[in-house]
Amino acid sequence: MFPFRVIDQASVKQLLDMKHVIELVERAYTLKEQKEASLFPMVFHEFAPGKADMDIKSGHLTGADIFGLKLVSWFGENPAKDLPALVGFVMVLDSNTGVPKGMMSGEPVTLMRTGAAGGIGAKYFARPESENLLLVGSGHLAAYEIMATLITMKHIKKVTVYNANSYEKAATFCATAKEKLQEMFLAPYRDDQELYRTLLDRIEIEYVATDDIRQATEEADIIITATPSHKPIIMKEWVKPGTHFSCIGADMAGKQEIDENLFTTARVFVDDVTQAINVGETKVAVQKGLISKEDIVAEIGSVILGRTPGRLSDQDITIYDSTGIALQDLITADYILKKAEERELGTVAQL
C-alpha cells in the first residue's frame, strides 16, 4: 500500500500563485530543452462529433523525477444535467518507482499555467519597453493572461480587450478588471509588502474594451490571442513592426486566430515543434506551404537558456505559438502536491 493524495479545486487555488507558476513553467521549458523532459503522443477522441470529446496530454520530467497526465473531457450537454461541460484532472507519478503520488482538479492548474505561458512569451520575445497589450478574448483565460503579462512586463500602461462575438462582454470584463485581478492574484503576496505594492501598481492601469480590432492591432505592442476561433481574427496588414504575439487559443486541429501570412515575415517560436505543426497556430502556415518546419527558429526553452536569440531588433515581429504541453501541468501539479503535504491539505487514501 502507498499514500495517494487527492486535492480539490479550492485547495489547488489556495496553493498556487502566478509568480511561482511562471517560474515553474519556465523550468519545464528548460528541462525539455535540456532533454530532461519529454512528451508522450497526445490522445484525442470524439464520443459524438461536436458534442462530446476528451483529450489526454502526458509526459515525463526526468529532471523532476515525475511523469503523469492531464485528462480533459468536454460534454456539451452536461449543463442541462447540472454538470460542468468541461471536466479535467492531473495525475502525477514517481518516475523512479511508478507509484502514483496524487491527483487534483485540472481547471485551476490549466488556467494558471496557460496564463503563465502568455506572459513568458512576452517576457522573452516582446520589446522590453512595450506599453500596450491587446488581449483577444475575454473569457476564462483573460485575467490569467493579463496578470502573467503584468508580472513579466513592467512598462504596460494600457490593456485593450476585444471579444469577436460581444463588445458588451469585453466592456463588462474591463469595468471590473482591476478589482478582479487584485482579488484573484494578490492575496499570496500580502506578506511581501514590496512585491504586493509593485503588483498593485502594475494592475492600476487603463483597461479599455474595443470593437475595432484593426485599430487595436495597429496600436498594440503585445497581442495575446486566447479564443476558440477557427478563422483568423487579426490580419497581417494591420500589424506594425515590433509587435509580439503570444498565441494561446489554437490547441487542436482546425483552430486559428491570426493570419497565416504573418508567419512569412515573423520570427516564429513554439513550445513544442511537433504539436505546433500538427495542432497549433503554426499548422495552417505549414499546411499551406508558407513556411516549413525548418523556419521555426526554436522552442522557447532554447531562448530561456540563452542558446537561441529571441528578438533580433525592435522591428521584428515575433510569434510564440503556445499549444500547451503536459510538462507545464505536471511540474505545476507536483509543486501543488508538495505544498499540500506541507499544509496537510487534500484527502489521503492508502491504495
Identify the meaning behind each predicted range.
Residues 152-200:
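NAD(P)-binding Rossmann-fold cofactor-contacting core
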Residues 17-21, 26-35, 123-127, 151-154, ...:
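Generic secondary-structure signature for well-ordered alpha-helical cores
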